Amino acid sequence: MINALKGMKDLLDKDAYYYEKVIKICEEVAKNYGFTFINTPHLELCTLFKRSVGESSDIVGKEMYEFIDKGENHVCMRPEGTAGVVRAYIEKKLDKNTSVKRWFYYGSMFRYERPQKGRLREFHQFGVESLGIPNVYEDASIILMLVEIFSRLGIDFKLQLNSLGCSQCLPKYRDRLVEFLDSKEGFCEDCLRRKNLNPIRVLDCKNEHCQNLLENAPLLINNLCTSCQKDFETLQQILKDNGVKFELDSKLVRGLDYYSKTAFEFISDEIGAKAAIAGGGRYDRLIEYLGGKSGYGIGFAMGIERIITILEQKEEKIQREGIYLCAMDEIYIQKLLHIATNLRKEYKVLLSYEARKLAKHLENADKNNTEIFLCMGENEAQNESLFYKNLAKKEEKMIKISDLKKVL
């Protein structure tokens, strides 16, 4: 038997139901905020992610699915969505006049990491990217969009905020941080590698010993320039005005190298202590990193598998939907196929091609979680009728075929 690869799984049944539910809500909210759909390729040149995600990131250092294709191109499966969207923005020359684009996307991402609860090697994300807007009000809107999504999904969260500064204040802080790191000994190999490539990423280390060494490290939030400080204070005030609670986390730097200024994470304790379920921030330098004209960008990505895990733990009762259409004798199936074809213009219809007893059909309809049960037997056929049962409300009656749409 051939099985799915480790860390990759089929999406079906209850998982598929929750996936569709999450995407539907995310899409509705994103459209209400003025975002439109974009779809980028699963396969990209490795250079795209080495420039954007950064050489110091675990993704580039350890986790990318990369290979040389038959055309001698060094390619990889996309490990995240932002870089591909920004690449599309530049490729379509939208950066030349700083066009404003608000896009949302969803689909598979790929990272070769240790599979665990809520973390797979092929996983799904929903994300948004807003390009061409420098204003901190857009940062607030992006965060408020996520707040609305989680509110509709019924998911509790903690919001953590930080500012990573800009090209004015970040270099000075980086020098101070490196000086501090050089004064300490005992950092892990990852931290030593990050110190040389992007020292701020050292703050993101999860090693307890390294965190102890970082206890008195200088904080970027205390080293912001006047402009960054003003924007960060404005962002906090907007969130307060909208009733959004948050915590300041001076060591929140996100896992990718392209972030600047606003950085945020949404945390849930429902799938483990401080598990991130969404995160993002501003990346004004990324467009230029990828060869475009200097511009502005902010976005977020949400891990759909983790959201599904939370929803399943809540044991939400899956709502019945659709129509189950069946016959007690095979001679009626052709007639029912004609009825089903007409109904499918407006309704979801599952037609059984097998002639069974009423009890067996009802059992099958229940397994398929359908709401309306319609069956034709000899008596119904003679009277141009159907046996009707609402499986959610437990109502049943005989109805004329001519009245079917009126009843539905």
From Swiss-Prot:
It is an enzyme of class 6 (ligase). The gene is hisS. This is Histidine--tRNA ligase. It comes from Campylobacter jejuni subsp. jejuni serotype O:2 (strain ATCC 700819 / NCTC 11168). Pfam families: HGTP_anticodon, tRNA-synt_His. One of its GO terms (molecular function) is histidine-tRNA ligase activity. It catalyses: tRNA(His) + L-histidine + ATP = L-histidyl-tRNA(His) + AMP + diphosphate + H(+). GO terms for biological process: histidyl-tRNA aminoacylation. HAMAP family: His_tRNA_synth. One of its GO terms (cellular component) is cytoplasm. Signal peptide: none annotated. SUPFAM superfamilies: Class II aaRS ABD-related (SSF52954), Class II aaRS and biotin synthetases (SSF55681). Homodimer.
